[in-house]
Amino acid sequence: MKVIRVKNQEEGGQVAFSLLKESLAHGAKTLGLATGSTPLTFYKEIVKSDLSFSDVTSINLDEYVGLPVEHDQSYDYFMRENLFNHKPFKENYLPNGLAKDLSVEVSRYDNLIAEHPIDFQILGIGRNGHIGFNEPGTPFDIRTHVVDLEESTIEANSRFFASKEDVPKQAVSMGIASIMESKMIVLMAFGKEKAYAVKEMITGPITESLPASVLQNHDNVIVIVDEEAASELD
């Protein structure tokens, strides 16, 4: 696991984008994408670049269950607003959180990932060490699945909704086994509240109680952290 320390989130986005450019130059065709505030500067770098993504497919990590794609807190909406409306891709895939049969949707998404092996996966990390919506206790061998969100995750996401009661309680998430099959993983973390999770991910035991710790078993992970997120590292 290689750690790159940056001054701030803007520099972090620039570093992540330079890694992506290198990956694309070596033939990467499928990007695994994340939502939330962490990758926003990375997406801004993609949007303002003159690189063409017309041959590139994207596969997102997760989507809430029950939110229409028009809802401004759906991850589909987030991706369109921050990336897809500004930079055309060959294909963009997200889980369908409105599927009538979520078990069928889980199988569909696993098949999609199998058809489009991920070359470059961008990740954030939750305060509790979750990646995607793979919460503590998630088996490392799981693939796409329906998740009951942890109270801490619901709490963290409540700032984006009118009230905590409006936050979805479930999501469809790519599984840890699928994430680990990505050829390259770039995890970004910014802010003091991520410092403990970053430290445990890098130096702690590999344990399902901190899902991101499994990344120690991957041979091509780059962690981009600002000074605050790196503050508990030696």
From Swiss-Prot:
Q: Which UniProt keywords apply?
A: Carbohydrate metabolism, Hydrolase
Identify which residues the record assigns to the active site: D62 (proton acceptor), N128 (for ring-opening step), H130 (proton acceptor), E135 (for ring-opening step)
Record InterPro entries:
Glc/Gal-6P_isomerase, Glucosamine6P_isomerase, Glucosamine6P_isomerase_CS, NagB/RpiA_transferase-like
Q: What is its EC number?
A: 3.5.99.6
GO MF term set: glucosamine-6-phosphate deaminase activity; identical protein binding
Q: Name one GO biological process term.
A: glucosamine catabolic process
**UniProt-listed Pfam families:** Glucosamine_iso (PF01182)
Entry-linked HAMAP family? GlcN6P_deamin
User: Could you tell me what this protein does?
Assistant: Catalyzes the reversible isomerization-deamination of glucosamine 6-phosphate (GlcN6P) to form fructose 6-phosphate (Fru6P) and ammonium ion.
Q: Which family does this protein fall into?
A: Belongs to the glucosamine/galactosamine-6-phosphate isomerase family. NagB subfamily.
Name of the protein in question: Glucosamine-6-phosphate deaminase
